[in-house]
């Protein structure tokens, strides 16, 4: 694990203790994301629609004043999944952020739509009801995610 990754994990752990996570402007994570893409930074939100199926939308992440305040969280967990691991249709166990730190995955939602996620990708997973989604680890590497459960599980 690189020093930058350890520093990022530490920052999220401190945020979990405080009850929320902030990403300060000017950190290597933000600078790299904006410099390489030349477009705004987004997170993917998975949610259950009125049809009881999971849908996705891209939500822009603006940094007013250099800091993006996320929804309050309760704790943090690191999860490891082996290459080729597939979790068939499943609902999220709770409303949470899922941040891919290492490896790649493909998320499948309603209508066969596939979302590719890799290192640095942020998902806000809220499909706690309905059919759910499929998660498939792709490529030769393990996938490590940081899962941050939201304090408010009501979704209101």
State where each predicted segment sits.
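Bacterial N-terminal signal peptides
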Residues: 8-27
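A short, N-terminal "cap"/entry segment at the start of jelly-roll beta-barrel domains
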Residues: 21-80
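Conserved short histidine dyad/triad with adjacent acidic residue
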Residues: 60-64, 74-92, 127-129, 152
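Short beta-strand segments in beta-sandwich/barrel cores
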Residues: 86-87, 104-108, 122, 153
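Short beta-strand His + acidic residue motifs that chelate non-heme Fe in jelly-roll/DSBH
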Residues: 89, 107-108, 125-126, 131-139
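Short, conserved beta-strand element in jelly-roll/cupin
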Residues: 91-107
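Short acidic-glycine-tyrosine-enriched beta hairpin
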Residues: 111-129
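A short hydrophobic beta-strand segment most commonly corresponding to one strand
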Residues: 124-125, 139-155
